[in-house]
């Protein structure tokens, strides 16, 4: 994110802050070079469970700066600015720099704030997997395993191409709402913005995001969401258990029982699908999420 970082040797005690950073390091086979991880919205990928068990979990939520330092890290890779950005309550990059600990922030999340309403930043163009490929490539170079990075990128590119090829072109594009979570049924809903990972998923499936805002995580009332009239509602499954509506079954129960939302065509047509919430962040999980949604929509005949 505009910061130059130089390495004279590969890190030996890396801390992965945020699920995406941790899972990329694990996919690169670097569990023996990791001192700890923190901030996991959902469970680790099943194929990484064994490797992940070898790495200390600091917390599934935001860690403290002291907890990170107690692991004596020689490198910190972060998935989100909220973990090491200028407004982070955990630590700022300069806090690590003062201690001569190099840091890396995911290029997918280098966002600008465009006003007080864009709490999590905004994007003026659609996110693509290219940012993720850059991250995998750069992390693999930092750890001197560039060949593993290229193999992983090739695998993701093949999956993306296969997914696009599996969805036939149609004149009628499905429109999607991606509901991450809400503090309560009466509170505004946190949604995936049109140019973030959710917008990418809609695009790769030949559709569009019904929420037309550049904000990364717009919080909207249900009146506005109902007015957007999506063809499909994608509800996030989260393992963090911060709010009751983190659970997909709680979201579905609300959508089908509330007098207003139950009248939405998407609800009446049973066009509610469940997706791993981490896929709504621009991460390696995004392609998994797109595959999840495609499978459910095909099973219901909503895409051929």
PLM region spans:
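Alpha-helical, coiled-coil/dimerization segments enriched in small aliphatic residues
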Residues: 42-44, 54, 190-217
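Solvent-exposed loop/turn segments at secondary-structure junctions
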Residues: 20-23, 40-43, 63, 75-76, ...
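Short helix-initiation/N-cap motifs at beta->coil->alpha
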Residues: 2, 55-66, 214-222
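Structured C-terminal subdomain patch of bacterial secreted/periplasmic proteins
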Residues: 123-135, 234-304
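Flexible loop/hinge segments that line or gate small-molecule binding clefts
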Residues: 92-138
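Short helices/loops that flank or line small-molecule/ion binding pockets
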Residues: 65-73, 91, 220-229
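Bacterial Sec-exported substrate-binding components of ABC uptake systems
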Residues: 1-23, 125, 138-179, 298-304
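A short, structured surface patch at a secondary-structure boundary
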Residues: 16-86
């Amino acid at each position: 994110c505009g910061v130059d970082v130089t390495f004279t040797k590969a890190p030996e005690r890396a801390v992965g802050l945020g699920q995406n950073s941790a899972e990329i390091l694990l996919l690169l086979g670097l569990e023996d070079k990791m001192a700890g991880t923190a901030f996991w919205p959902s469970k680790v990928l099943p194929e990484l469970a064994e490797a992940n068990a070898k790495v200390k979990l600091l917390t599934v939520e935001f860690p403290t700066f002291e907890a990170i330092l107690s692991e004596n890290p020689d490198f910190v890779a972060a998935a989100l600015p909220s973990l090491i950005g200028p407004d982070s309550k955990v630590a700022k990059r300069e806090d690590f720099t003062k201690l001569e600990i190099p840091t890396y922030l995911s290029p997918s999340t280098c966002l600008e704030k465009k006003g007080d309403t864009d709490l999590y930043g905004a994007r003026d163009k659609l996110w693509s997997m290219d940012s993720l490929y850059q991250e995998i490539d750069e992390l693999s170079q930092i750890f001197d395993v560039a060949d593993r990075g290229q193999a992983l990128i090739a695998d993701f590119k093949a999956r993306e191409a296969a997914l696009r090829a599996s969805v036939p072109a149609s004149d009628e594009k499905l429109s999607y709402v991606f509901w991450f979570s809400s503090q309560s049924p009466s509170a505004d809903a946190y949604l995936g913005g049109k140019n973030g990972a959710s917008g990418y998923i809609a695009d790769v499936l030949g559709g569009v995001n019904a929420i037309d805002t550049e904000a990364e995580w717009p919080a909207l009332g249900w009146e506005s969401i109902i007015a957007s009239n999506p063809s499909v509602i994608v509800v996030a499954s989260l393992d963090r258990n911060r709010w009751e509506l983190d659970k997909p079954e709680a979201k579905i129960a609300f959508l089908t029982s509330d007098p207003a939302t139950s009248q939405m065509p998407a609800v009446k047509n049973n066009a509610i699908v469940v997706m791993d919430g981490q896929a709504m962040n621009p991460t390696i999980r995004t392609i998994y999420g797109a595959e999840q949604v495609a499978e459910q929509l095909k099973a219901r005949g909503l895409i051929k």
